[in-house]
Amino acid sequence: MAGSSSRNASSFGAEEDEDGALISTRGLEAFGRKVTTTAGHLIGPIDPTSSTHYQNAMSDLHKQLRRPNLQRSVFSFAKTTPTDLVRSKLSTSEIQYRALTFLPDELLRNIPENENSYSLFQGFQASLPEAGEEKGKKHRRRISRGRKLIDNASEGGSEGDGPPSVAKLKKEKEALNHRLEMMGIRKNMASSEIHGIDNKIANLNSMRRIVLDRLAGLEQEESMLEHENVENRLEEAQEQIEDAEALGKSIVGAEEGDDVENSGMESSFMSESIYEKLPSSASTSSSKGSRRHKTIRRKSMPILHEHFEPGSSIREIQAHDDMVTALDFDVPFGTMVSSALDDTVRVWDMNAGRCMGLLEGHTASVRTLQVEDNIVATGSMDATIRLWDLSKARYDPQDKIKEEQEEGEEDQLAFGEALEREQQTHIPQGTMQDCPLFTLEAHVDEVTALHFRGDTLISGSADKTLRQWDLEKGRCVQTLDVMWAAAQASATMGSTEGTWRQTGRLPDATADFVGAVQVFDAALACGTADGMVRLWDLRSGQVHRSLVGHTGPVTCLQFDDVHLVTGSLDRSIRIWDLRTGAIYDAYAYDAPITSMMFDTRRIVAAAGEDMVKVYDKTDGRHWDCGIGAQREASEEMVERNIIEKCRVKDGYMVEGRRSGMVGIWSC
């Protein structure tokens, strides 16, 4: 038998050598022959020398195999594939679990190192304890109440419980340690969340800066497109065509007249009628001047300043060489007009930070001015009021932009700040010579306050009068004597409410008799040096109401539909209710108020410091805006940086300082 086994093995090895590279059924056939040989050896004739154990075992197995159920299972098992065999051993859920939880080695190599000292399971435990802890606290309170009742009931018979057991103390210690561990894990989790939030905020801030730069570029491009002068060029071309047609007709008519009169005037080469019909040099120059470039009003409003942080500096302009006495602007990033003690009135392009030109005509410093669309009104110490139309300016921002684009990038990088300072100090000549409209002359002393709306202009002067002007006719239509009105009010009311009030302080030489005025239709508000605010009716020329409260000269005021806000040298700002005449609110600063203005949200005031005082009307918050707000607490205030005038519109604030510098801020 051993020989047959070795022979079979040798034959099987030979067959493997022949077809080793192929997978066939020969292996199974060889395995079957081995099983048959072994079975024949076990079931064959009984060898007296061998044991009967194998024979008995095979007999029992033969009886079991003859059962039908077992035969069917064996036959079905023979038909199954290895895949079916695996599926029969594992359930569907187990197969899915193994497929989902299997991780290849590539992913395992890329797992980052964990810096946390706690595991994922511990973090999961720490994120769930709130409800359980509340339930445990309630349960412990109930148990403690029950124990107290039992102790109280057993106080008479027993001497009390003994010392707590060691096991109980160990259990409480483990619970406390577990709670401390969970608290430490929660602290680490909260710290990780804070770091994650900080990273997200930093990413969002960087994205915001990128979008903000994009918005600034879009507004710059929008401004350039609006100054392309296509409409002006079209108008000029049409006017030139009309002039050429008119000139051609005049020449033809002159030639016909020359033919008729040629017999009597042979010595002349052209008739006099030609000189009458040809445009003169003066008219030609004036027509050319009227066709000069007109400043295009912006069709869209800038919104860049709305996205700056409150208190952010937008631009600084060295507007003058002396203290700023008045300033105003039309719209954010629009046109600003400023005046100073250097006796100049300058017009500025705030979008580019460049001077557009000078408004020349006053013989003294301008104390007050107002900008409304294209119209500018200026009141001077020479007792005159002049009106200007900025739409007739010859300023072209594209010329300066083209010059800058022609310069090299390296020069711009090296001398960028010097170029910006040069642009601010450079004053174009002759750009505003067509802007003057007319001059209003009636006051006999310096004009200290003015305000116009529509065709009505009100001016206040040191001659103690208010004058109403009709801007269509250019003449004074009414004169209001403040002292006479105060005396009339005193005589009518029989009290001292309307009389000229002494503030109880030494007279201030710098205080203007008429500090501020504002007109709306027939209503006029006027603040004077006696601290009174008088409300006039222009139809009757009488004082309708007097508001008493300030103890110093009123320097500024402004009203809307409901409230009137006034600022005074007594360091206070008062908000009045126009319906009742009572004080609605009031607050004070550490120095006199020299300028004030409000918009829909905030009240800004210049109070003798190097920063503008801002009062948020919506939430009642006071805060500072300006270079003083960015100054260290240990640094001293520079007197040259003290702010004298401030204006605000739609969160876009402009302030003028004693040094002549003008700062533009977002508030």
Curated annotation (Swiss-Prot):
InterPro entries: G-protein_beta_WD-40_rep, WD40/YVTN_repeat-like_dom_sf, WD40_repeat_CS, WD40_repeat_dom_sf, WD40_rpt. Residues 1-11 have a biased composition (Polar residues). Gene3D superfamilies: 6.10.280.220, YVTN repeat-like/Quinoprotein amine dehydrogenase. It is found in: Mitochondrion outer membrane. Belongs to the WD repeat MDV1/CAF4 family. Involved in mitochondrial fission. Acts as an adapter protein required to form mitochondrial fission complexes. Formation of these complexes is required to promote constriction and fission of the mitochondrial compartment at a late step in mitochondrial division. This is Mitochondrial division protein 1. It comes from Sclerotinia sclerotiorum (strain ATCC 18683 / 1980 / Ss-1). The lineage of its organism: Eukaryota, Fungi, Dikarya, Ascomycota, Pezizomycotina.
